[in-house]
Regions:
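Extracytoplasmic "Venus flytrap"
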Residues: 1-4, 61
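Hydrophobic alpha-helical segments within soluble ligand-binding/sensing domains
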Residues: 3-11, 36-39, 87-91, 106-124
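Hydrophobic alpha-helical
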Residues: 8-9, 24-26, 30-92
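Short helix-loop-beta junction
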Residues: 11-20
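Paired acidic/hydrophobic, glycine-rich loop segments that form the ligand-binding mouth/hinge
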Residues: 56-57, 102-104
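Glycine-rich loop/hinge motif
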Residues: 95
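Glycine-enriched alpha-helix->loop->beta-strand junction motifs that scaffold or abut catalytic
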Residues: 98-100
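Hinge/cleft segment of the Venus flytrap/periplasmic-binding protein
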Residues: 107-153
Length: 153
């Protein structure tokens, strides 16, 4: 799934760029079997890289939170535009503060509906569709409040 998202982003950027514009896209596969491995990989981007990326697109919650912390730790807030994934309290706070520009969130209500539909289909037919396409939402500073739970508003 991550590769599909990566290739969609790459295709869109290549189609939308101006003729005289150069866009270099790099994909990094992070071993996220432990939070420490993820933190080390993100640290290497900020410490060992010759140049920081202009935009960093995170494909999961752990990487998004690690990048957020690295931006602060290495004094790079405002130097890298970050598109995160999911909406934990940490990520929502980062968006509210303008440290992360936006995050992609799956429509959890739709996931729930599709799950129930799949269970009902499996119960009655003995099988179900192997793929359900779920909607995505973009969380920005303008709409971050709608993603906060009652206690965290």
């Amino acid at each position: 799934e991550t590769n599909l998202i990566y290739y969609q982003i790459k295709k869109e950027l290549e189609e939308k760029k101006k003729e005289d514009q150069t866009v270099n896209i790099s994909e990094y596969s992070i071993d996220n079997s432990s939070d420490f491995d993820t933190e080390e990989f993100v640290r290497d981007i900020f410490v060992n890289g010759n140049t920081l990326p202009d935009v960093l697109v995170c494909m999961d919650e752990v990487v998004t939170e690690c990048v957020y912390q690295a931006l602060i730790d290495y004094n790079q807030v405002g130097n890298v535009d970050v598109v995160g994934f999911y909406y934990s309290d940490v990520i929502l706070d980062a968006i509210s503060k303008g440290i992360i520009s936006s995050a992609i969130a799956l429509d959890m209500e739709e996931i729930g509906r599709y799950s129930i539909n799949a269970l009902e289909e499996y119960s009655s037919l003995g099988h179900t569709s192997s793929y359900y396409s779920v909607g995505q939402n973009v969380i920005t500073r303008k709409n971050v409040g709608t993603y906060r739970t009652g206690a965290n508003q």
